[in-house]
Each structure stands twice: as structure tokens, then as C-alpha cells.
Amino acid sequence: MAEQSDKAVKYYTLEEIQKHNNSKSTWLILHHKVYDLTKFLEEHPGGEEVLREQAGGDATENFEDVGHSTDARELSKTFIIGELHPDDRSKIAKPSETLITTVESNSSWWTNWVIPAISALVVSLMYHFYTSEN
């Protein structure tokens, strides 16, 4: 169900979702949307165990706590199979409104390792000059 705008929304009850809580069928809820992550288990950067622990339930708060990247959020959309039935939405805990934050970053990959590497080089040069003077 990649293009939900072309099709009617498929609703799943909480009871239906809870049945999909194993490695053969791994469903979870994020922001009232239902995701089938069975084929993504082995690819998940945090390991498949993290997803299996959340399977069959609402993982919204844990998903937001981790602080997933924009790319991860876009990728997650490809696994949407429907939505939690409106009658069941009150049965799950609402995530704290303060947890729903996204950080847009214009920094690229090099800031994650080049800046620390240069800093380490500067510190080692300072140490070398300091020890050579004594």
C-alpha cells in the first residue's frame, strides 16, 4: 500500500495487530499507522531484536526517543500497510507531545568524523611540541 492516496485506507484493529508479534510477521504502530516490518528485520540498523520487542503494539514513543533521521522516516513510509482503527486509538497510550520533534540537519557525513579527526591531530601536535620542549 505504497500509494495510499489512490486507495481506500485499510484499517486494522488492535487485536489484529497484536497477532503479528513474531519474526515471521512483524507489525507495529507508529502515529496510528500500521507498518509491516517483517522484510526489514534483518536490515534494521538497530538490530531486529529492537523491532521484535515492539511488534504487535504501539512503538511511537520508542521510535521518537531514538531520534530517527529524515531518511529513516522516509524509508519507514514504504512499509505502511494501513492505519489503526479509529475505535482502537484510545486504547493505546498517547506519546508525549514534547517527544515529537524532528531535527533538520544540513551537515554532511564529514562533520561526523573529519572534525574530530582534525581535533585529535591538533591535540597530538600540541602534545608533541609540549613534550619536545621539556
From Swiss-Prot:
Residues 9-85 form the Cytochrome b5 heme-binding domain. PROSITE patterns: CYTOCHROME_B5_1 (PS00191), CYTOCHROME_B5_2 (PS50255). The chain crosses the membrane at residues 109-131. The modification N6-acetyllysine is found at residues 7, 10, 19. One of its GO terms (cellular component) is intracellular membrane-bounded organelle. Keywords: Acetylation, Cytoplasm, Electron transport, Endoplasmic reticulum, Heme, Iron, Membrane, Metal-binding, Microsome, Transmembrane, Transmembrane helix, Transport. Heme binds at residues 44, 68. It holds the Pfam family Cyt-b5. The modification N-acetylalanine is found at residue 2. One of its GO terms (molecular function) is heme binding. InterPro entries: Cyt_B5-like_heme/steroid-bd, Cyt_B5-like_heme/steroid_sf, Cyt_B5_heme-BS, Cytochrome_b5. PANTHER family: CYTOCHROME B5. Cytochrome b5 is a membrane-bound hemoprotein functioning as an electron carrier for several membrane-bound oxygenases. Belongs to the cytochrome b5 family. This is Cytochrome b5. It comes from Sus scrofa (Pig).
